[in-house]
Design a protein with these regions (language model features):
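Matrix-facing interhelical linker segments
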Residues: 1-315
């Protein structure tokens, strides 16, 4: 929640549900999908920038292709450059996401580019009084992005190793243990462990870095003359009027005026969002599994098939 004056923090989901219901009644069903177009554009722009920089410099775009410390540092530098370039457009996308549909005109699909370029042109001295120059936002945004990325990769690898170790220990006690299994063989169970580790790491990163994102989002929104829905009532709108000088000033002001819980404003919305993500993943996995079973030729399972389905643990 980017507004610092709201009384309801909505740290748990159930306090947010009545407000969301009122927003739906007063607006329309798309109120929770605001900014989805610009968000997708910014994500696509990020991938495009990474691809261009990678092809221009020869730096690895994927961390799995890093075979040395130098290549790892090049990969991290590529990520930093990409995040820095898209920061102005991320700011524009964030405004579209949080602004009220009642008090603001609905943005066109490509307005994110116009607003992003405007912030680049106002690099040093923004035309709007309280807006921070984009260079003052780039460093904390890049720092958050790269730290979150490295933490995600690290936790994912650790989780994957733990899950494989648990499964390996379980199957070593069974008759299916076979050390001569081909390590290069593809197995859907390996992919299942990788998916679970990726989901767990993603959820953990969203929760851990939520307070930092709250601060950075407030810096992005400051001075943009954005009017947001009043989430205390769900029936009115309020402007965002802040005057932070930077990341630490925003952090200290939040702690002083709102307490530590002010860093977790809107955490209940994140819980609902993650629950929706898990539901979609579960539903998609179920549908794909059912379709795969329907397309498979009828075949009675054998003990050999069962053994092969478990040997993936020893690669």
């Amino acid at each position: 929640m980017v507004h610092n004056g709201l009384k309801n923090f909505h740290i748990v989901p159930y306090t947010l549900l009545p407000v969301v219901a009122r927003l739906h009644r007063r607006q329309d069903v798309t109120t929770l999908w605001k900014g989805i177009g610009s968000t997708c554009i910014v994500k696509g722009l990020n991938l495009a920038v990474e691809d261009v920089v990678s092809k221009g410099t020869g730096w690895p775009k994927e961390i799995g292709k890093c075979d040395s410390v130098l290549q790892f540092l090049q990969h991290i530098t590529l990520k930093c450059i990409s995040l820095a370039i898209i920061t102005p457009f991320y700011s524009a996308s964030l405004v579209e996401t949080v602004q009220s549909d009642i008090a603001s005109d609905k943005p066109a699909l490509l307005d994110v580019f116009r607003e992003g370029f405007m912030r680049i042109l106002e690099w040093g001295t923004p035309s709007r009084g309280r807006m921070l120059p984009i260079w003052a936002i780039v460093f904390p945004t890049v720092s958050l992005g790269i730290t979150k990325y490295l933490a995600h990769i690290t936790l994912k690898n650790i989780t994957e190793r733990v899950l494989r170790f648990q499964q390996r220990h379980r199957h070593e006690l069974s008759d299916s243990y076979n050390v001569n299994y081909n390590k290069n063989s593809a197995n859907p169970l390996i992919e299942d462990i990788s998916l679970k580790a990726n989901i767990f790491s993603f959820i953990a990163m969203e929760i851990i870095f939520f307070p930092v994102e709250t601060i950075i989002h407030r810096l992005h929104i400051q001075g943009t003359r954005t009017i947001v829905d009043n989430l205390d009532t769900g029936t009115s709108v309020i402007p965002i009027l802040t005057g932070y000088e930077g990341f630490m000033d925003c952090y200290n002001s939040t702690i002083a005026k709102e307490g530590v819980s002010g860093l977790y404003k809107g955490f209940g919305a994140l819980v609902l969002q993650l629950a929706a993500h898990l539901a979609i993943i579960k539903l998609t996995t179920l549908v794909v599994s059912e379709i795969s079973n329907l397309l498979k030729p009828a075949k009675s399972p054998t003990s050999e098939d069962s053994v092969h389905s478990q040997k993936y643990l020893f690669n």
